[in-house]
Amino acid sequence: MNTAAMSDHIQRLKDDHKDFNVDSLDLNLDSDPYLSFKKWFDEACEKKESEPNAFCLSTVDLKSHQPNSRILYLKDLRDNELVFYTNYNSDKAVQLDTNRKASMLFFWPGLQRQIRINGIVSKVSTEESDQYFSSRPRSSQIGAWASHQSQKLDSSMDIEKRVKELEFRFSQEVPRPEFWGGYALKPIYFEFWQGRPSRLHDRLCFEFLNESWLSYRKNP
């Protein structure tokens, strides 16, 4: 690996950022963090941000105390909870079984915005998981069965073989596997970040304390 070349690229990128030029958060946010999230999410969709429902999910392994992050997709926002789906045998699911605290990060560079959300995660009902799974493309349904997510794989041919076997096994409807389903994150903290000129970015936080939301700002 040519680390010198990589270093050159990093050096060139250090100052290769356009200045931020958006108004202060006071003009953009509601006092209700859920309404503010929906407003920003809708704007990200309307402005054609690339994959606006993509977010980084961070969990922690309690044995090693090692944080782990990966990109997922938000699939629903209901009852003031954010819903995503995964394999219940995956590393993230194993970590969530022992530590239900997790953090989401949405980033929309075109709008110069990001939202960090900390919360407590729980599994959604089997009915909700069934309903979402049935809406997925058949290829994705087969893929959910075929992937032994987070387990070591000797060859990509192994999983391709499983896919062919499963396509034959499920010649018609594909049922949801018991090891696959949804999680819902109940927020206890929101941080809305808006880029501003001279790197004096706005950070407006909402923390759920004593059954109500407390709002405050943080230094950039």
Residue ranges of model-derived segments:
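Binding-site signature for planar aromatic cofactors or substrates
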Residues: 1-220
